[in-house]
């Protein structure tokens, strides 16, 4: 069993984009921005504990940071990890937080 402290550090934020909205509506899948060193097992445990839902499976993607230019200097944004969390039938996570 993982420590609760670690589970709280695994999920950083929900990832909201056009693609993630479509997958949420069509495939009952939620997309999260997660810690780079997080494993699929940790992500599954964290989502089940924090949102009290049943997780079907977890798929992860390492996203490479973009190269950006400011004047004559080049820099690079940090790499990050994205997790597609498929929920069981009937399970739902509401991020609107009661907004009407």
Swiss-Prot record:
Q: Which UniProt keywords apply?
A: Ribonucleoprotein, Ribosomal protein, RNA-binding, rRNA-binding
Q: Which GO terms describe its biological process?
A: translation
Instruction: List the molecular function annotations (GO) for this entry.
Output: rRNA binding; structural constituent of ribosome
Q: Does the keyword Ribonucleoprotein apply?
A: yes
Transcription regulation keyword on record: no
Give me the Gene Ontology terms describing cellular component.
ribonucleoprotein complex; ribosome
**Which Pfam family, any one, appears in the UniProt record?**
Ribosomal_L23
Q: Which cysteines are joined by disulfide bonds?
A: none
Q: Do you know which InterPro entries this protein is assigned to?
A: Nucleotide-bd_a/b_plait_sf, Ribosomal_uL23-like, Ribosomal_uL23/eL15/eS24_sf
From the UniProt record, list the coiled-coil ranges. Answer: none
Matches recorded under HAMAP family: Ribosomal_uL23_B
Tell me its family: Belongs to the universal ribosomal protein uL23 family.
Tell me, what does this protein do in biology?
Answer: One of the early assembly proteins it binds 23S rRNA. One of the proteins that surrounds the polypeptide exit tunnel on the outside of the ribosome. Forms the main docking site for trigger factor binding to the ribosome.
| Subunit structure, interactors included | Part of the 50S ribosomal subunit. Contacts protein L29, and trigger factor when it is bound to the ribosome.
Query: What is this protein called in UniProt?
Result: Large ribosomal subunit protein uL23
This chain's source organism reads Idiomarina loihiensis (strain ATCC BAA-735 / DSM 15497 / L2-TR)
GN (gene name): rplW
